[in-house]
From Swiss-Prot:
DNA repair found in the keyword field: yes
Protein's job: Involved in DNA repair and RecF pathway recombination.
Protein's recorded name: DNA repair protein RecO
Annotated transmembrane regions: none
Source domain of life: Bacteria
GO BP annotation list: DNA recombination; double-strand break repair
Organism: Lawsonia intracellularis (strain PHE/MN1-00)
Amino acid sequence: MEWLDNAIILELGSFRESDVWVKLLTSQHGVISAFAFGGHRSRRRFCGCLGILNEIQVRVQTSRNGRFLNLQEASLINGPIQLRTNKNRFGAFINCIRFLEVVGVSSDAAPPVYTLMKELFYFFEKNTQPYEIIPILFRLRIASEQGYAPIFSNCAKCGRLINNKGFFGISDGIIVCSICINYIKTPIAIGYESLELLKRVQLASPYDWKLSENTKSAAAQKYECTEIINAFVEYHLGITWSKGRFLKV
């Protein structure tokens, strides 16, 4: 079987003298691994486009025994410039990629995740606003794309609109109001501005994942969102960040 798709290169590795192993996020087939035989040498088939984070168009063929995929040819669509020269941006984007790899992306989930990664790519490539919190917020968005999508606007128990402080129950995966706080275990308080940010993360482009312009409010958003997202992802997806890498727990 053979197919064409667009892809972002997540990882690259070499084996033997001229061959390349690639991990790709594709727009229709999810995250895949493939072999590019002659990838280091063939300018005709790969045009020097096999670079980390490059967006490429690929032609992929299943091997005769059906056990692996061969990258037959590829052409460059777009490549990063700022990402490769700014180590902080590069590190933040790679953190998002490593999380995506651990979660995995099926063919069903591929189209929205691919669109999100392209938006994130352009955000890191061209935007100058603060981005340190983006990898944390990205984890919530990916969890939401996987079906773990808390509703942050209304109390999950009584339905009241939350227009002040809410309380998040990690194991239940829900937000409740102050009246219904006894319905959840170990509630974590979260302010209205943080709730608004989490709603934007679920629905909008990374360009809209902006912290408050007020320094004190922004600090509270960072703390509250980081605490809730990391706990939520660990409990429901079984993934934690430890010693510089993501681990399944």
